[in-house]
C-alpha cells in the first residue's frame, strides 16, 4: 500500500521570518518560538501595532458603581 503524501502548511514567523510548520504540535504557531511570541506581544504593549477603526467612548463609572463589580 502506498503512503499518501500530505503537504504540510508552512508559514513565516511574523517576527523573524523563519519557516514554521503549521501543526497542532507547534504550541507557538504562527511564531517559531516563545521568544518570537513575546517579542510580538511586547510590540502590541508598546503601541507598535494598532487596529484601525474609530475609538469608542466608554461610559464613566462612579465610585459607588465600582463597589459592586
UniProtKB/Swiss-Prot annotation:
Could you tell me the keywords of this UniProt record?
Metal-binding, Zinc
- Any single biological process term in GO: regulation of DNA-templated transcription
The UniProt record gives the binding positions of Zn(2+) as 13, 16, 32, 36
Quote the record's cofactor note: Binds 1 zinc ion.
SUPFAM superfamilies, per the entry: Glucocorticoid receptor-like (DNA-binding domain) (SSF57716)
State the InterPro entries in the record: DNA_gyrase_inhibitor_YacG (IPR005584), Znf_NHR/GATA (IPR013088)
Annotated family: Belongs to the DNA gyrase inhibitor YacG family.
Q: Which HAMAP family match?
A: DNA_gyrase_inhibitor_YacG
**In its UniProt entry, what is this protein called?**
DNA gyrase inhibitor YacG
In the UniProt record, the gene name given for this protein reads yacG
